[in-house]
A protein has these predicted regions:
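Hydrophobic packing residues in well-ordered alpha-helices of helical domains and bundles
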Residues: 8, 94, 98-101, 134-137
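Acidic/histidine-rich alpha-helical segments that form the ligand environment
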Residues: 68-116
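Short, contiguous alpha-helical
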Residues: 19-72, 119-151
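Globin-like tetrapyrrole-binding proteins
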Residues: 2, 15-16, 83-93, 129, ...
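An N-terminal domain-cap segment
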Residues: 1-28
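Short charge-dense sequence patches
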Residues: 11-14, 46-61, 86-99
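Non-transmembrane alpha-helical segments in soluble domains
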Residues: 12-15, 35, 39-43, 98, ...
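General secondary-structure edge motif
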Residues: 14-18, 81, 113, 117, ...
Length: 151
């Protein structure tokens, strides 16, 4: 599967069928909250919402190995940067949220085309280049697609 094509084209198509109030198979996010959460992850990959590394140096290599593997995120994988309650939605509609996701994916691709060789720190997994971010964003999109029964 072409991971970049999935996050750029296929995932947004899947989102078109998502009810903004849908409850996932696990977790507390609703449909639109998940879309906005994914958008935040994509914008982080371009250095926006930049976070320092939260993983201790002795663990970052092992964490990155997991991120680069084909092992899926487990349901309810904790995220130390998020509260136990989902963030309130910021877009008026799920269509607006999907449009923002699409905008951020394009910005992600353009950023790395303009800044070839750029490295952006992921707060859990360390320094990532374009290919590594693409792999992680794909893994993340698959995780939430399964959570909301889109796959």
């Amino acid at each position: 599967m072409d991971k970049l094509n999935f996050i750029k084209t296929e995932f947004p198509k899947l989102l078109q069928n998502l009810n903004p109030e849908a409850k996932g198979e696990w977790g507390v996010m609703k449909g639109q909250q998940m879309v906005e959460h994914m958008t935040d992850s994509v914008s982080q990959a371009t250095g926006k919402n930049n976070q320092k590394l939260h993983t201790t140096p002795d663990l970052v290599g092992r964490y990155k190995d997991f991120a680069m593997s084909d092992k899926e995120f487990k349901p309810n994988t904790p995220n130390a940067l998020l509260s136990d309650l989902p963030s309130p939605i910021t877009k008026a509609t799920i269509k607006d949220a999907i449009a923002e996701y699409n905008y951020q994916i394009t910005a992600f691709i353009n950023y790395f085309e303009t800044n070839r060789g750029a490295i952006i720190t992921n707060p859990f997994f360390g320094d990532f280049n374009f290919e590594e971010w693409t792999h992680l964003l794909h893994k993340h999109a698959i995780h939430h697609s399964k959570q909301f029964r889109l796959l």
